[in-house]
Amino acid sequence: MFLLHEYDIFWTFLIIASLIPILAFWISGILAPVSEGPEKLSSYESGIEPMGGAWLQFRIRYYMFALVFVVFDVETVFLYPWAMSFDVLGVSVFIEAFIFVLILVVGLVYAWRKGALEWS
């Protein structure tokens, strides 16, 4: 009726893929020596003791640039498969992709006008 047996390999893969990290953490928790002390709790970077606090504040501009980059990176991920199969999909999918790009361009213009892309 529903041919659920065709998904057996998927469920097997999913179970094995879930068990491997669980077993890895479990085995390392059992076999790893437990040593707590001040050296274990101190900050460490490249073999050198840090000079000063470990917490730094970053300007919000870095986050805005990263956010705009991620949006257009995801756009590329969505548009590449569409471009590779454009001849099969037809005109309706072209219109949908055009609307998708138009929405992203509107967002880019909004970010530009708000000054999110200004570095100084």
From Swiss-Prot:
It is an enzyme of class 7 (translocase). Keywords: Chloroplast, Membrane, NAD, NADP, Plastid, Plastoquinone, Quinone, Thylakoid, Translocase, Transmembrane, Transmembrane helix, Transport. It holds the Pfam family Oxidored_q4. The chain crosses the membrane at residues 9-29, 64-84, 88-108. It catalyses: a plastoquinone + NADH + (n+1) H(+)(in) = a plastoquinol + NAD(+) + n H(+)(out); a plastoquinone + NADPH + (n+1) H(+)(in) = a plastoquinol + NADP(+) + n H(+)(out). It is a multi-pass membrane protein. Its EC number is 7.1.1.-. One of its GO terms (biological process) is photosynthesis, light reaction. It comes from the Eukaryota. The keyword NAD applies. One of its GO terms (cellular component) is NADH dehydrogenase complex. The keyword Membrane applies. Its main location: plastid. NDH shuttles electrons from NAD(P)H:plastoquinone, via FMN and iron-sulfur (Fe-S) centers, to quinones in the photosynthetic chain and possibly in a chloroplast respiratory chain. The immediate electron acceptor for the enzyme in this species is believed to be plastoquinone. Couples the redox reaction to proton translocation, and thus conserves the redox energy in a proton gradient. PANTHER family: NADH-UBIQUINONE OXIDOREDUCTASE CHAIN 3. Belongs to the complex I subunit 3 family. This is NAD(P)H-quinone oxidoreductase subunit 3, chloroplastic. The gene is ndhC.
